[in-house]
Amino acid sequence: MTLLRGDDFFTSRAVTVAVEPRTPQTAFPEHYHDFWEIVLVEQGAGVHVFNDQPYALCSGSVFFVRDNDRHLFEDVEGLCLTNMLYRSPRGFRFLSDIAAFLPYGPNGEWQGQWQVNAAGMQQLKQSLNSLAELAQSDAPEAIAASESLFLHILVQLRQQCFQTQSSGSERQGVQALLGWLQNNYSEEVNWGSLADRFSLPLRTLHRQLKQHTGMTPQRYLNRLRLLEARRRLQQSDDSITTIAHACGFSDSNHFSTQFRKAFSQAPKSLRHQAFSREE
């Protein structure tokens, strides 16, 4: 597995933050870093496999990555993102500790996937552009300014993340819906009921989901289900039928057909490959 080193990305060893735009982000094999980063998706689609857990990417996706995390990008389609790099939560010169602004849950668990709305992403992009300029200098005043702006961006992210949980505008409702689908893809979904739940007209729901994900709502839902099914086929001993039902497919034959369409491979073939690698 590839180790990405901070010396290849930070302007100098004195600099504590860096900005790396990827426009586009191509498929990239599994890797890890000796630094921490925050990944902000501006547009496009793809799959982010984070510590063996797949996530479907869309505009507004945000991932917090630690130095001991493994991740990769695959199945990318017009994916554009920006990486905000930092040495570590305690690796700053003028900030003492940023742990309070990182995605730790109430019991200390890491909750590294967030979603922000389009307006919030636009504000963040402006701040990232300014940060990219500051991060080019290792003068003490530039480092202090860059760390201050980095903290400001963290605060922006935290505020925008909470905003997506409220009813607010249509865009905020869609972002909250995307988060709900990511965590509840295995449930039986009635789009009309979901539209009511997130205070969205049904036609708006379809239009906005297509705009954010590049897919129809049902295709996006199937994508989430298939990604989880692929993970379970590779990592568990459960039967194909059990996995299909656990991931929201009521018919295992239909699941196999959809799986072959998505991955050009039958579920049985993938499982055989996974078991062969372990032997």
Curated annotation (Swiss-Prot):
Localization per Swiss-Prot or TrEMBL: Cytoplasm
One record GO biological process: rhamnose metabolic process
Pfam families with a match to the protein in the record: AraC_binding (PF02311), HTH_18 (PF12833)
Residue ranges: DNA binding: 192-213, 240-263
Cytoplasm in keyword set: yes
Record-annotated HTH araC/xylS-type domain positions: 175-273
Gene Ontology molecular-function annotations: DNA-binding transcription factor activity; sequence-specific DNA binding
Record key words, sorted: Activator, Cytoplasm, DNA-binding, Repeat, Rhamnose metabolism, Transcription, Transcription regulation
InterPro entries, alphabetized: AraC-bd (IPR003313), AraC_XylS_family_regulators (IPR050204), Homeodomain-like_sf (IPR009057), HTH-like (IPR037923), HTH_AraC (IPR018060), HTH_AraC-typ_CS (IPR018062), RhaR_RhaS-like_N (IPR047220), RmlC-like_jellyroll (IPR014710)
GO cellular component: cytoplasm
Source superkingdom: Bacteria
Site (Interaction with sigma-70): D251
Function according to Swiss-Prot or TrEMBL: Activates expression of the rhaBAD and rhaT operons.
Self-association state and partner proteins as the record states: Binds DNA as a dimer.
Protein name: HTH-type transcriptional activator RhaS
Species this protein is from: Pectobacterium carotovorum subsp. carotovorum (strain PC1)
